A protein has these predicted regions:
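Boundary/linker segments of alpha-helical solenoid repeat arrays
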Residues: 32-36
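Long, intrinsically disordered, low-complexity segments
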Residues: 26, 37-121
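Extended, hydrophobic/aromatic-rich amphipathic alpha-helical segments that build helical scaffolds
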Residues: 1-25, 47-57
Length: 121
């Protein structure tokens, strides 16, 4: 919840409050005797910082794609940090393919098509 609150505060341009939420997380997780060193200032709070903090805190919880899509950073960050995928990532990857079983199950198939860029559209 602190990461969500920090992002909301940043979006409201309340960087001081957003940084405090991040610092609360870091005080909880920091090594004794070094917690103060882990704190950030409001000037360091950016969406990229929050995304990096979310990756550290939520690694393995399968939230990364949603975070990058929601913040409109998916293409930028894949191109920057994943050299193997850099040449393959395309604008249409912002949407995922709709499972074929879902497309087969709809009654009015002419109204529901596969997302652009994936087979069947």
């Amino acid at each position: 919840m602190y990461l969500i609150a920090a992002e909301a505060e940043l979006n409201l341009n309340h960087k001081k409050e957003g940084a405090e939420y991040i610092n609360e997380i870091r005080r909880r997780a920091g090594k004794e005797g070094h917690k103060k060193e882990m704190e950030i200032s409001q000037d360091e709070l950016t969406i990229d910082f929050i995304l990096d903090e979310r990756a550290r805190e939520l690694g393995g919880e399968q939230q990364r794609w949603f975070d990058l899509k929601r913040t409109d950073k998916l293409l930028e960050r894949v191109q920057k940090y994943n050299p193997d995928a850099k040449s393959n990532i395309k604008d249409y990857h912002i949407l995922r393919p709709i499972p074929q079983t879902q497309l087969d199950a709809v009654i009015n198939k002419e109204e529901f098509k596969q997302n652009t860029g994936y087979s069947g559209n």
